[in-house]
């Protein structure tokens, strides 16, 4: 669906003077989704990124003007410039925008403008945001409500991470990493869990992070709804401070939407949800792990509270194929030592890695798990070093890639070599450090056994590396 510029006056009336919107870092998951929505609303979109890829190519095909690399002349004609939090202050396009007094806003500020005239559902939390956002989006789509959605990862069944719908509903992932979710004014807010992460934003103070989440929930109108996980002790500690209606979900006896009798067969989960009115709903999921049951129950709770029929909820959840890079099965391959399965997963925080390993163990029985792990950011590796040592010791074989810096400078003692040394000292697994990823296939062939599940784990380039591996193994 594409609108003329005249029609935009009706959609976002306050933005009628805006003609061209320029995105610095347009290839990022959150940025590209918003760019796609605005492109389909009829705005002229331009954007730049350091590398070309599937996302930038798709935007170019849809009509966006894409530049690879950053240069001052790229902002020509822009009415407003949108920046991702990854963009440094000395970026030439950002510097030029400020010199020319072109308004520069954060990604979340633009998302807030899109949400302003819609019924917004925002999903926040340390883990599970992308999957939960995708599940809610698919339920509303199944219910023929044609929602707009903007997600931080690919919604597999839609084949994209953003969609412009015709209805008033907007479902969006809310980003706490730079506290920019405070710009959003939703009608429903979901918080999946809360753990220390992105602590540089919160000056290393977890109490400040908690207070920021409460502030986010108070952006709800007095008639709004907060949906929170009852299994998370930090969230339950915050509930008395939230001056809005709160509905809870989880395995906890105290949950309003309570999960019972969870079982996993292979990579399929099934369980029962006891609703606040004691209605029992049997759920089937084709994505593994208790963490996905929690994500699905958050989505179910939102849908039930908003009056969506059970049939649409259950069909959408049963059909849900996952979000991009969340336990993404790349295939089974015959190698010299036998048949193996390769899975790509985005989890890069110790808790996420832990639940992925548990889901794999449940579905893969007594077979071995071989992990290819790429730490993401030196600061996260430093802050959660001991937790990484413990969780990475849970696999049967471990290949460690160098830290994916994500623009950070190296930190002494927070590199892959230090992580390998500490894991080896714990004595449960002997990690292999592979700095030259062109050697990865050869190293794997030396250690894999028949029936192994290979988990490529991390938020950096490990996904591209594992997909390249899958392509080479097909030939």
Swiss-Prot record:
One of its GO terms (molecular function) is ATP binding. Its EC number is 6.3.2.8. The keyword Cell wall biogenesis/degradation applies. Signal peptide: none annotated. GO terms for cellular component: cytoplasm. Its main location: cytoplasm. It catalyses: UDP-N-acetyl-alpha-D-muramate + L-alanine + ATP = UDP-N-acetyl-alpha-D-muramoyl-L-alanine + ADP + phosphate + H(+). GO terms for biological process: cell division; cell wall organization; peptidoglycan biosynthetic process; regulation of cell shape. Pathway: Cell wall biogenesis; peptidoglycan biosynthesis. ATP binds at residues 125-131. Pfam families: Mur_ligase (PF01225), Mur_ligase_C (PF02875), Mur_ligase_M (PF08245). It is found in: Cytoplasm. InterPro entries: Mur-like_cat_sf (IPR036565), Mur_ligase_C (IPR004101), Mur_ligase_C_dom_sf (IPR036615), Mur_ligase_cen (IPR013221), Mur_ligase_N (IPR000713), MurCDEF_pg_biosynth (IPR050061), UDP-N-AcMur_Ala_ligase_MurC (IPR005758). Keywords: ATP-binding, Cell cycle, Cell division, Cell shape, Cell wall biogenesis/degradation, Cytoplasm, Ligase, Nucleotide-binding, Peptidoglycan synthesis. HAMAP family: MurC (MF_00046). Cell wall formation. This is UDP-N-acetylmuramate--L-alanine ligase. It comes from Haemophilus influenzae (strain 86-028NP).
